[in-house]
Amino acid sequence: FLYKFLNDKFLYEVQQADEKLKDSENVEQALNDMSEEDYEMLLMLLPPATAKLKREHFISYLFNHKNDEKFNALFDSTLWDISNTNLDVFSVSTGSGDKIRLFDQNLSQNVTESNRRSDFCKAMIDKLVTFSFAEAFSQKYDFFATIFEYLIKDYNKDFGKYAEYYTPHSIASIIARI
């Protein structure tokens, strides 16, 4: 979910930053066709609170490689690289100064059966590629509220109509910056 949000937010912001991209039918292809120098210049024009993504971070890139052997390793390394690339903007420091990153280093390791990890990552990418936040970025309302309510609707279902939950400060800080 967060990966998709960052990806779509990035694409929205590059369209705002570059007039040529505003009318592009395929923004990602236009970005892929840019020279490395032009791409780096475009990244400098983005608002500070926008994640900086490399072209290989795009969801479409992962989607096009989902049938590669060990896809889960590509998926994990992509999220980890996004975390490291944007560490100064999207991280929270602990009391001892350690940085808490956006994504865990090996997210797919949470799937117990090692032979199912790539399938899990493929299924996630298949779902993410069909959804878009694009319209939400120009709106001025809290679209997260509905999403969180949906995600946690069954969490505390026996104690009232709406779920009761606690968002840790580190997560709330990251969400607030996004």
Predicted regions and their residues:
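Non-catalytic, mostly N-terminal accessory regions of nucleic-acid modification and defense proteins
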Residues: 1-178
